[in-house]
């Protein structure tokens, strides 16, 4: 069971969002400018990365913590900090 939890603890969820751009920079939801390739911390436990496609469209990729199906007898614990250190981890009793 511990191997199953370990395997899935490294999977993340990414979402692409088309964003406005000005002077070759992504503009985030707080109107802050970010260079292409730059990553920044998002609200909660997430990370954003700015990139541009070959067509000149600007996007940021949102990377979030995985969702778990916690085995019986286990629970999730989160730690403060930046992504990915703040992601919840499955804690299971030793067998």
From Swiss-Prot:
Belongs to the scoloptoxin-16 family. It comes from the Eukaryota. InterPro entries: SVWC_dom. Keywords: Disulfide bond, Secreted, Signal, Toxin. It is found in: Secreted. Expressed by the venom gland. GO terms for molecular function: toxin activity. Its main location: secreted. Pfam families: SVWC. Contains 4 disulfide bonds. One of its GO terms (cellular component) is extracellular region. Residues 1-24 form the signal peptide. The keyword Signal applies. This is U-scoloptoxin(16)-Er13a.
């Amino acid at each position: 069971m511990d191997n199953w939890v370990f395997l899935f603890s490294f999977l993340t969820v990414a979402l692409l969002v088309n964003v406005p751009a000005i002077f070759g920079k992504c503009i985030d939801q707080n109107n802050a400018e970010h260079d292409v390739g730059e990553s920044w911390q998002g609200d909660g436990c997430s990370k954003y990365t700015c990139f541009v496609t070959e067509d000149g469209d600007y996007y940021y990729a949102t990377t979030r913590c995985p969702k778990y199906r916690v085995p019986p007898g286990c629970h999730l614990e989160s730690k403060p900090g930046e992504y990915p250190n703040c992601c919840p981890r499955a804690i299971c009793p030793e067998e």
